[in-house]
A protein has these predicted regions:
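Secondary-structure end/capping motifs
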Residues: 280-389
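Sec-exported extracytoplasmic/periplasmic mature domains
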Residues: 69-72, 76, 106-110, 125, ...
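Short, glycine-/small- and polar/acidic-enriched structural segments
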Residues: 25-210, 215, 219-232, 258-260
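Bacterial N-terminal signal peptides
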Residues: 8-18
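N-terminal hydrophobic or amphipathic helices and topogenic motifs
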Residues: 20-106, 343-429
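Periplasmic peptidoglycan-binding/anchoring modules of Gram-negative envelope and division proteins
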Residues: 443-505, 534-542, 586, 594, ...
Length: 605
């Protein structure tokens, strides 16, 4: 589950891979038990949690550096912040293999699981089947992935092009849920693709099994593979630096980045879970652990905010941050000199959840990407794909995470991503922009008084997509009925300049408008309809979600009137077909190179 990112070490790693190469090596595909509860890992003998030193897993992920800092390192330290919170010395152990974590969890070596919300959902059925004591309780969100993970493919432009393709993903890893989300939003199921699994998330020299065990290596070596879920450095290598792979220097010919979690920024949620029996016996200790880690996140967030001030940053504080990050760079990037890379990973490619994020994730049942919604979505998809036999929802600890539980913290104002309508349109039409998927909905006959309450399902779906793809441009397209345009074009092609219409029982002649006039009118009408949807969405956020204007960012919306340029039916022959032409579309457009970053490498030097 190693998701190390952003190193300027990337070119060194690429060199090592090209020298050591995967040419001619066998790809070791892994099977995944269906349902997963039949996996041999669930045959592990159940044991009580061992007393004394508390074993706590971490994974190769920047946010876990905060956990290590709170413990004063990986070794047991009763006097550390984390040790005091846990009421016992805590030994932090890197366990990137989820199966290994599950064995320790079941046997009682550790009461904790460290994974993503998708991974916890995958294991919940098997753990609960052993004993209700093992049912996982998710008690903390650490972070969101906001650039570290993604998907790469050849022969794919939109996500719907994945139908019939073969893709490779790490078995039981964080990318399984990313693949599920991409398929769902493309209107596909697991049955529409062939999924192959490998043991590692990236090349792992410590894997004792010779051959290729990672998605990038499989994509490179197996010509039947069309795409892979991978970490960002691997995506860059596979696509010749984020463009299109040529087949040289470990790239795959024709491969290009489809998206990363910079676009799909609310998909991969990293969490901690605890055994039900241990939580029942130690609720205050679990809450104290979570609170201490979130307080440590607040400390790190303060340092990241200082970096984001760029030239105005407090230089003494910047030096302090780099100094405390040195050992973390050594642990996660195997080089203490790679401090800037670690900070970029922590502050750009991931997003610390903080107290406010945990309150939102666990406490807001209306959130389309929160704990309740994520569990429901993941479980439904896993059941449909045969990965679980019945829905077994993980529970949440449901702590209150206001920093002062008696006084709610006022919501912070949201910083707009784009400065103007012109800027978001330029991003949507840039050469690097890519349409990922669309959602089509019908327009009512009159848009002047469009109210979201009349179309709650439409606006709930819009909100889900807008929130999940927090780094994308959201284009609202309006389409008009083309019947009158077709009629005028036909009449004009025959040389007509007038049209007869029945008025008051008698036919009268009227001047026939120019085709361009009809097209322009349709463009204006369709734009006004699309804009009415944006206006109604803002109303939905205010009234259904209780957001103020300062808490909304509508700058990512690009409103576009398509007029009659893209009809669903070019020659509508029924009222139903005319209605289907008069539609709205929500288009999610990836524009990763156009999204401004909070800071860059130059701000750390």
């Amino acid at each position: 589950m190693n998701r190390a990112i952003h190193a300027s070490l990337l070119f060194f790693l690429a060199f090592v891979m090209s020298v050591g190469g995967a040419f001619g090596q066998k790809v070791n595909y892994s099977e995944i038990s269906k349902p997963f509860k039949n996996d041999p890992v669930f045959k592990t003998q159940k044991g009580a949690v061992k007393p004394g030193i508390l074993q706590m897993p971490f994974i190769t992920w920047a946010a876990d550096g905060v956990t290590i800092h709170a413990n004063g390192g990986e070794r047991p330290n009763a006097g550390s912040k984390l040790g005091r919170a846990a009421g016992a010395p805590v030994k932090l152990e890197r366990v990137d293999e989820f199966d290994k974590q599950l064995k320790a969890y079941v046997s009682g070596d550790s009461p904790f699981l460290r994974g993503t919300i998708g991974m916890i959902n995958l294991a919940a059925e098997g753990l609960t089947a052993i004993s209700p004591d093992l049912a996982p309780i998710v008690f903390m969100q650490l972070s969101w992935s906001t650039g570290a993970d993604g998907f790469v493919a050849k022969g794919v432009n939109k996500l719907s092009d994945l139908k019939g393709k073969t893709i490779v993903v790490q078995r039981t890893g964080p990318h399984m849920d990313l693949v599920n989300v991409l398929l769902q939003d493309a209107g596909l199921t697991l049955a529409d693709v062939t999924v192959k699994y490998v043991a590692d998330i990236t090349e792992n020299p410590d894997n004792p099994v010779p051959g290729i065990n990672d998605p990038a290596g499989a994509f490179r070596s197996d010509s039947t593979v069309d795409g892979a879920a991978a970490i960002y450095p691997d995506i860059l290598t596979l696509t010749a630096g984020g463009t299109v792979g040529t087949g040289a220097e470990d790239s795959v010919k024709g491969a290009k980045p489809i998206l990363t979690t910079r676009t799909a920024s609310r998909v991969i949620a990293d969490v901690y879970a605890v055994r039900s029996d241990w939580f029942a016996a130690n609720p205050d200790r679990v809450k104290s652990i979570a609170k201490t880690l979130l307080e440590e996140q607040k400390f790190f967030r303060g340092h990241l905010d200082n970096v984001a001030k760029k030239k105005s940053a407090d230089q003494a504080k910047l030096r302090e941050f780099k100094q405390l990050s040195r050992p973390l760079a050594g642990i996660f990037l195997f080089d203490e000199a790679a401090v800037e890379d670690f900070v970029m990973w922590l502050g750009l490619d991931s997003e610390l959840a903080l107290f406010s994020g945990n309150e939102e994730f666990f406490g807001n049942d209306k959130s389309p990407v929160g704990f309740a919604a994520a569990n429901k979505r993941i479980q439904s998809y896993y059941v449909a794909g045969g990965l679980i036999s019945s829905q077994t929802l993980p529970a949440a600890a449901k702590f209150k995470w206001f920093e002062s539980e008696a006084v709610p913290v006022p919501a912070a104002a949201v910083k707009p991503v784009f400065s103007s309508a012109q800027a978001v349109r330029a991003a949507a039409e840039s050469s690097s922009a890519g349409e990922l998927f669309s959602y089509t909905f019908g327009f009512p006959a009159s848009m002047a008084d469009l109210a979201w309450r009349d179309y709650p399902d439409v606006f709930t779906t819009i909100h889900e997509k807008v929130t999940r793809y927090g780094g994308a441009v959201v284009q609202l397209r309006g389409h008009a009925d083309n019947m009158f345009h077709n009629f005028v074009r036909m009449k004009r092609s025959r040389g007509a300049t007038t049209d007869e219409r029945k008025v008051g029982g008698a036919f009268k002649k009227f001047p026939l408008p120019q085709v361009e006039e009809v097209a322009n009118a349709a463009n204006k009408l369709s734009y006004s309809r699309a804009f009415a949807v944006k206006r109604a969405y803002a109303q939905y956020l205010r009234e259904h979600h209780g957001l103020s204007a300062q808490e909304m960012d509508l700058s990512r919306f690009d409103v576009k009137g398509m007029g009659v340029s893209d009809p669903k039916h070019s020659n509508p022959s029924s009222p139903q077909q005319r209605t289907e032409n008069m539609r709205g579309e929500l288009i999610i457009i990836g524009v990763e190179s156009e999204i401004p970053l909070d800071f860059g490498m130059e701000d750390l030097r």
